[in-house]
Each structure stands twice: as C-alpha cells, then as structure tokens.
C-alpha cells in the first residue's frame, strides 16, 4: 500500500516521502498513530500543493534574510562602557547588549543569532557575524567606546 509519511518513521521514511509499505503495517501502526496517510490521488495533490507552498515560503525567507543582510552591513552599533587604565573595559559587551542596540535601531534579531565567540573586552571596532538564515550570514560592525 502506498502511503504519505506525515512524520519521520525510523527505518521506513521521512516526512513527505511517498512509499510502499505492507498493508497491515499501514493500517495497524502508521494510520492509527497518525504517522502516515493513504496515498490517494486527492491526498497526493494536497501533498504536492503543500510542498510547493513550503518551497515558496523558504525562498521568501531567504530573500528577506538577504535584504536584511544588506541593511545591517551598512550599520555600525556604538556601545558605551566604563573603562579603566589603559583603555581596559570593565565587564564586557555581550550578544544581549548587541541585540538590545539592534532592537533600538528597529531590527528584530534574537541574541542567539549573534555569533559572538567571546564577549568583547576591548575598545574599538569589532566585526560580529550574525546568522540571519541557514545560508545567509551578515557582518555587523560594533564600536565599543569609553563612556
């Protein structure tokens, strides 16, 4: 019996796959647990439409991320901190502070998208990578200056 998998099933198929499985397995396991549905012509058309819509949404998300990258790479964030002797920063500039500054500028970027290996502990300009999409990474200039 041909079925369309609604969820990943170990050893059988992944979400969206259309495969042939034993009738008893399909009826007694896959359909009862709502892991799959029969691959009728109506269900196949609905499945194809769903896949097309998902592909369009993914394409739009990629375009939005690329547009955001172009805007962000033109920006420079200025963070003022307390400093001691020799320009040493008390504390550090974290990804949360950078996310807050971006929010004030009108960008909604989660602090987990900011790929800061170590908090910034020096004065000057630092280039910080932002993971906007699986395929799009922007570079943001963060300037740390004395308060």
Swiss-Prot record:
Xref: InterPro entries: Ribosomal_bL9 (IPR000244), Ribosomal_bL9/RNase_H1_N (IPR009027), Ribosomal_bL9_bac/chp (IPR020594), Ribosomal_bL9_C (IPR020069), Ribosomal_bL9_C_sf (IPR036791), Ribosomal_bL9_N (IPR020070), Ribosomal_bL9_N_sf (IPR036935)
Keyword RNA-binding present in the record's keywords: the answer is: yes
Do the record's keywords include Lyase? Answer: no
Q: Which UniProt keywords apply?
A: Ribonucleoprotein, Ribosomal protein, RNA-binding, rRNA-binding
Q: A single GO BP annotation from the record? A: translation
Q: Which domain of life is it from?
A: Bacteria
GO MF assignments: rRNA binding; structural constituent of ribosome
Cite the residue spans of the region called Disordered: 40-60
Function as written in the Swiss-Prot or TrEMBL entry: Binds to the 23S rRNA.
Spell out the family assignment given in the record's similarity comment.
Belongs to the bacterial ribosomal protein bL9 family.
Q: What is this protein called?
A: Large ribosomal subunit protein bL9
Origin organism lineage: Bacteria, Bacillati, Bacillota, Bacilli, Bacillales
Q: Which gene encodes it?
A: rplI
